C-alpha cells in the first residue's frame, strides 16, 4: 500500500496569507504534483492542523483543492482545527460513536490495521485523548489483537527533542503509548505532524515513528530554543509504503533542479 502524507497545511480564509504565504496555493501545487507523479497511491492522509483557525471557508476551499485527487483522503484534526466546522465541510468523514474524527482501515496484504486518531480538544494547544477516546482505541486494538498497527495522528505521543513543544505536546500521549505498547500484534510505525519539521526515530522500547514537514511553514531547527524562527520550506510531502518487507517513509521535497548525469543501473556485486 502506498500512502501520501501531508501535514500542517494551515489553510486560512480565501484571499488571506499566513507568514507571507498562501497556504491554499501551496496545497494546490502539491495536489497537482501528486496527481502527476503519485497517482498510483492508495490513500492520502493529512495529519492535522488543516486550517489555521478552524475557518469554515478554509475547509470548503480545501475540499475544492483536493477534488482532483484520484485516491481517497483521510483528514485528521490538530489543535488549530475545529471539529464542528470541519465536519460541516466534510460530513462524510468517519467519526466514532462519540463524534471524534477517528477510524480504522484494515489491510490484507500486508496484514495491518491502520488507526487514525483524533487528539484535538477545543482551547488546548497540546493533544488531548480523553477516556472515551482511550476506550475506543482499546476496543479497536482488541478487535484484532494479533494484527500489527500503523498509527496516524497530529500530536506526537513520543519524545522528539523540540523545546518549543515542551508544554504543548501530547498531554495524554503516555496513556496512548501504554495501550500501544501492550498490543500483542505490535506497532509498525507512528506517523504524526504538529512539530512542522521532518523527524524520524525509534522509542527505547522499539517503536518507530516519523513526522512530516509542515506544508506551509516550518521551524529553522533550534532544538533548545523555546522561540525558534518560522521559515518557508520547499513544497513537500511524505510517501509511505507498507508491504511485507516493512514500513518505508520517504520525504519528497519539490525543489526545482535539473538532472546532471543519469545514474547507471547498478546490478552489483
Residues of each region from the PLM?
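N-terminal active-site segment of His-dependent metallophosphoesterases
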Residues: 1-61
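His/acidic metal-ligating clusters that form di-metal
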Residues: 30-43, 127-208, 239, 247-248, ...
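Active-site neighborhood of phospho(di)ester-bond hydrolases with catalytic His/Asp-centered motifs
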Residues: 5-7, 42-49, 73-79, 118, ...
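Active-site environment of divalent metal-dependent phosphoester hydrolases
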Residues: 12-15, 52-57, 79-87, 122-125, ...
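Active-site-proximal beta-strand elements of phosphoester/diester hydrolases
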Residues: 2-13, 111-121, 150-152, 207-213, ...
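Binuclear metal-dependent phosphoesterase catalytic core
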Residues: 21, 28, 179, 199-269
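Extended active-site neighborhood of metal-dependent phosphoesterases/phosphodiesterases
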Residues: 56-143, 172-186, 205, 227-241, ...
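Short glycine-enriched, charge-decorated loop/helix-capping segments at active-site entrances
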Residues: 16-22, 92, 162-169, 225-227
Amino acid at each position: 500500500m502506498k500512502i501520501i502524507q501531508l501535514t500542517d497545511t494551515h489553510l486560512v480564509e480565501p484571499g488571506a496569507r499566513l507568514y507571507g504565504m498562501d497556504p491554499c496555493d501551496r496545497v494546490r501545487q502539491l495536489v497537482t504534483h501528486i496527481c502527476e507523479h503519485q497517482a498510483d497511491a492508495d490513500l492520502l492522509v493529512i495529519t492535522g492542523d488543516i486550517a489555521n483557525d478552524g475557518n469554515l471557508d478554509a475547509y470548503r476551499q480545501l475540499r475544492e483543492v483536493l477534488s482532483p485527487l484520484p485516491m481517497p483522503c483521510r483528514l485528521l484534526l490538530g489543535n488549530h482545527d475545529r471539529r464542528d466546522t470541519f465536519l460541516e465541510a466534510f460530513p462524510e468523514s468517519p467519526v466514532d460513536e462519540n463524534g471524534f474524527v477517528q477510524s480504522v482501515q484494515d489491510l490484507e496484504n500486508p496484514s495491518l490495521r491502520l488507526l487514525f486518531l483524533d487528539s484535538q480538544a477545543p482551547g488546548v494547544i497540546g493533544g488531548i485523548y480523553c477516556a472515551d477516546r482511550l476506550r475506543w482505541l482499546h476496543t479497536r486494538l482488541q478487535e484484532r489483537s494479533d494484527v500489527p498497527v500503523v498509527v496516524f495522528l497530529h500530536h506526537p505521543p513520543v519524545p522528539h527533542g523540540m523545546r518549543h513543544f515542551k508544554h504543548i505536546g501530547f498531554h495524554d500521549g503516555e496513556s496512548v503509548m501504554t495501550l500501544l505498547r501492550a498490543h500483542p500484534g505490535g506497532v509498525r510505525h507512528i506517523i504524526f505532524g504538529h512539530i512542522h519539521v521532518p523527524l524520524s526515530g525509534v522509542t527505547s522500547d522499539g517503536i518507530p515513528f516519523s513526522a512530516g514537514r509542515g506544508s506551509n511553514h516550518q521551524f529553522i531547527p533550534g532544538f533548545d530554543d523555546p522561540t525558534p524562527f518560522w521559515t518557508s520550506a520547499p513544497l513537500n510531502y511524505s510517501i509511505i509504503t507498507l508491504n511485507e518487507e516493512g514500513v518505508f517513509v520517504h520525504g519528497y521535497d519539490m525543489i526545482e533542479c535539473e538532472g546532471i548525469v543519469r545514474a547507471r543501473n547498478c546490478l552489483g556485486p
